[in-house]
Amino acid sequence: MIHGLHLTIAELAVVVGSIVLVLARWLPPATRGRAAAGASVVTLAGAAGTLPDPRWQILMVLVADLLIGAATGAAWLLGRRRARREDGPGEQRGGDLRGDGQSEQRGDGPGDLPGDLRGDLRGDGQSEQRGDGSGGRGTRRRDGRGVRARWWVALPGSLLCAALVLGGGVAAWALPVPTFPEPSGPSPVGTTVLQWTDQSRDEPATRDDADRRTVVVQLWYPAQGAGAERAQYLGRTRREADVVAGAVAGYLGAPGFLLDGPTRAYTHAVTGAAPAEGRFPVVIFSPGLGGVRTQNTAWAEDLVSRGYVVAGVDHPYDSAAVVLDDGRTVKTRIAATGDRAEGERLRTAWTAVRAADLRFVLTQLGRLDSGEIAGPFAGRLDTARAAATGHSIGGAAAMQAAADDSRFTAAINMDGGLNPGQGPLRQPVLALTHEVRDKADAEFVTKVDTVLGAGGATSYRLSVPGSAHLTFTDAPLYLPPVPALVGSLGGSGSVRMTEATTAAFLDATLSGRAVDLRAKLAEYGTLSVHDH
């Protein structure tokens, strides 16, 4: 992938070659044929390099090429037909009357080549005119491609093809296949996906009394060595990634193909790699409403490289789509009601469900560490040093889980709204909030400060200039760089900010490393500290 352009070399060849093909119609006759021929070779070679699975943006460009090819072929055929008509049957009869069986040929070129092709071959770019006394009036000039349409006929087609080529190129840049930044720590990263059922809880989203709450968890962990095959993003397989991306797009009201890029991405983790020796602090992550367990993969992998285990949680019937071990896909049942009071009630209810999910996952990680659940993680997971973390409603759920369960020794809220009425927090908290731009943002920050101020440990709120709600996720790596959508920090800048601030906080609170936390956080924005 070419940095900055978000195109592979093959894709760039398709786009550049197609631009030249569009422009070739308007070049001087002496260069038109050579430019079109060269561009055709480049485009075909690039197209072959995108097979067998070209991105939809490149398909747009190739449609333009097909239109150009069809128009060129039609012009050539029309030129041949016109040449035959202008040769006329009379000359054939003249040859027959001479008795030599030969038909008379016009011009100086071979066979029935259009006159201006002969001109092009001579290099003078001139079209040969038939001597019928018309002076060419009412005719179209013909070149080496046959009949050349008048400019006002060709212009709309050229503009359409140009729009397809440029539109495809811009779309490929704006909606790229994400490239994940290299983790900053020394440890290789492994990953695996687990599914657990909490037999003590009913599934609140169904009416089946026998249905129990099930969660899907992706673990990222320090591994013994780097592997050759990197893990698929958004799912265990490409098919699962396609399902999840389509569901996320549908939840946002967008067509699924717009999120084609993330389904093609691979991360730095290696699926099933052997865990490294040692015991590592645990970080449990809850995604945003309609989000999925992998939405903060870049952040998770960076923390793991620094010596943490991260567990990303899918919440069935809340996450956009959760693919279960039996192949079933559970999609979200949460939708906007238009009623503010009802919306707040649902938000509170699902925050509680998510908080219970996080507590259950912490319990299961403890069972993995003890060997009660068989697997390679026995003795690796230090659940006595555990942080509840999340984004958006996941951040609120993390705060609720920490308030409800003292086993969590720290908490991180990434731009999640908090209810001042929730229970007090006894753990240190880091709250990352987007830039304050209006009254609603100011009210949002005030509620967060109220909760942090009521806690029992020193907590921090960092307002990050240039950030938006999705800045704290992987979204800046694959969504258009629209500040209102993903902020203005850039893809890698957004990821590095989230990694640096949260890692400093976890180093200070879970790992006991010497960190000037206040100074480190203040590097990235406006810091408010709630001392206790």
Predicted regions: what they are:
Residues 143-176:
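Internal/C-terminal transmembrane anchor helices
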Residues 317, 323-380:
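Alpha/beta-hydrolase active-site loop
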Residues 5-10, 31-82:
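Membrane-embedded alpha-helical segments of integral membrane proteins
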Residues 361-425:
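Primarily recognizes the serine-hydrolase "nucleophile elbow" in alpha/beta-hydrolase
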Residues 433-495:
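Active-site-adjacent alpha-helix of alpha/beta-hydrolase-fold enzymes
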Residues 222-224, 233-258, 294-340, 465:
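Active-site machinery of serine-nucleophile hydrolases
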Residues 170-283, 491, 502-504:
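Domain-level recognition of soluble alpha/beta enzyme cores
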Residues 264-280, 285-323, 438-441:
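Short substrate-entry loop that stabilizes the transition state in hydrolases
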